[in-house]
């Protein structure tokens, strides 16, 4: 089911369309999983973030009404623009830029809107009211939203209107860089949309899990050809795959059920290029008690950027930046997956409401990262 609300008539067809399918950055992939479709009974949002600034950090922010944990660019020291997060009321949001909604450009203030929403919203209805009343911001995005009341929906929104698509009970939805309500055959991310469609069709028997999306973040199948880039050892053009040279992070946000405390949400955050980095846990209830590897200067992100350059040997060359050294990434992936398996195991044994346990997890997380760094760089 979807609902369209337009506050003003849209302008004529675009004179300028920026960053379409061949774009170098700002081309994310997202999915929403309803509570009944997940392996944990919690609703989830997944976001593979692509950006020109590939350095991210986690931070816990005190909003106008609610505190929240979110992803920020390392240059955003004031934490004004989040690219995905969850608050203490169980409200979570992430986005894809959409390139077929606005008539002239892409809308550059989506991060400001998401920070504002995380600070004041408890429900999908709160967020919808924000959009209906007008935000005063230049936006153009597919906003993935879940709440603690069982709500889950995409809002395909721009400055002067939005269309809401509710996730079917027991179902899933996903988006790339075009909106279903936008201008037909415009926008970007069509190859990735085909790829994530094929991935999501293979629904696991026990439901979608964080591990499912961590695998998706490192899935090298081309959406149009179906070809798996990892089958060979040559250089391959990877700009239209889910993991792109501009992939800056991946995150799985686990929301809460109506039987849980609203601040029971958590995030599995992969800093930097996902094939060269692994997921680390952060709990909303833990506040600013975050792992040092992914907050502040985020050394795990810095390492992932270094490794991304290693597997893209011509990255500094404009023509060569989007060519992946398959042989090199295949050497790194097993080390990443082994480290991630251990990290998930340790996190799941940690009580996110217990400050001492979280502190212990964070300290051990640093030690595990140092061991990973030694293995992956030698």
Describe every region a protein language model picked out:
Residues 1-6:
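N-terminal secretory signal peptides that target proteins for export/translocation
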Residues 10-21:
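Bacterial N-terminal signal peptides
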Residues 20-21, 137, 158-161:
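Hydrophobic alpha-helical segments
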Residues 27-85, 89-119, 141, 147-378:
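C-terminal, well-structured catalytic/ligand-binding subdomain of enzymes
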Residues 123-126:
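Alpha-helix N-cap recognition
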